[in-house]
Every structure is written in C-alpha cells, then in structure tokens.
Amino acid sequence: SRGLGDVYKRQALTVYGLPGSVLETYCGTAIPFYPVNSGACGAETAWQYDLDTAALTISGRGPVADFAADVAPWALFDAEIRQVTVEDGVTALPESSFANCTGLSRVTLGSGIEKMDANWFAHCPDLTELTVTAADTVFPAAVFAGVGDGLTLYGYYDTSVMDYARQHGLTFVPLGCLHRIYTDSGPAPTCTAGATRSRTCARCGADLGTVELP
C-alpha cells in the first residue's frame, strides 16, 4: 500500500496537524507540515494558540485581516480558548473576532486597539476580566450583551475604560496613571519676563517636571 510520502510525490501533498503529533513526526522533512494552532492572520500579524495554557496570542504590526467569525484562523479552538492577548502593535481586529469562544474568561487588548466591535464578545458568557491599555478606546453600545454578570474592567485612570465602567456600573481596577490631568504651580509670567512652573499630576501627585511659560 502507498503511504503519504507516495501521495506527496504524485500530488504535492500538504499536511496540517498539531505540533508534536505523530503526524508531524511521520512527515519529517519529506512532506510539508503546517501546525493548525498558529499562522499569519494579516500582512504583518500572526496568531498562536498555546494548547497547554488555552491562551490565544495575536501579535505583529497593523490590522488583522477581515474574516467571518466561523472562519477565524483560530475557530478550531473556539470552545477551548480561555484567555486572549492582543499585543501592542496590533491596530484592528475583525467583527466577531472572539464570538462563540464560550469558555473565554480573560482578554487583554494592547495599546494599538482604539475601537472595539459590538460583536467581539457575542456568546462569551464566561468573560470576567477585560484589560484595555489604550487611553481612548471606543466602546460600542451593547458590546458586552453576550457576557455574563461579574465583568471587571482593568485600565488606566482618566481613560475611556474608566468612564465606561463607572457609567455602566462595572467594577474598575486601575493599572496606574497616565498623568493626563495635571496642575502647574509657581510664578506666573509677566509682561516682561516668562516663568518656570512646576507640573504635578492631579490624580496621583507625580512630579512631571517643569514647564517654561513665555
């Protein structure tokens, strides 16, 4: 009987499977083998699903390519994914990116994500922690309609995630301060001379240095 190697020689066979599997060992270097738990998802973006930790990581630079929820590159693992990390260089994700990830509990969005889609978390009843590191991320109406009770939002003081949490009665946990609100103290400039004033964060009291006023 013929093996996969014989088929490959005749039909240029490509094999997809799990890394470290018997199938990968069989293919060796003779037959092209591609893991089903990682790959490209845009011109400069990639995804990887860790089978041991049930964690999906999306990395790279720029937007992820558009796709429907049921054909997302990681759709094979929708029922298994427990946590998602979108790294800072990624700037956009398609509609319904994590819809139907029914066991998803934690998501971290990098600083490049400034707009969320209303269907990202459709049918994600177990989502309990969402970390948003961008300062002005847009939250669509009903973005958490498919999420159960007990959602906690993590983010920085004086950002859109803090405002959203307060407006919707959600628990907010601060990650720190971006020093977006500050006060200046010291002499005021005059008609004939400028002034050097000290700048302090109004939220956390951090010393932000000095500012020269003409």
Residue ranges and their predicted role:
Residues 87, 133, 176-214:
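Extracellular modular ligand-binding repeats in secreted and cell-surface proteins
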Residues 30-44, 171-181, 212-214:
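Low-complexity, Pro/Thr/Ser/Gly/Ala-rich linker/spacer regions in secreted
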Residues 44-51:
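Short, exposed beta-strand/loop patches in secreted or surface proteins that constitute
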Residues 1-5, 10-21, 34-37, 53-62, ...:
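Structural signature of tandem-repeat unit edges
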Residues 1-5, 26, 211-214:
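Short, intrinsically disordered, charge-balanced linker/junction segments flanking boundaries
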Residues 22-32, 143, 160-169:
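Short, aromatic/basic amphipathic alpha-helical patches
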Residues 94-97, 117-120, 143:
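Consensus positions within tandem repeat domains that build extended binding/scaffold surfaces
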Residues 65-77:
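Acidic/polar low-complexity surface segments
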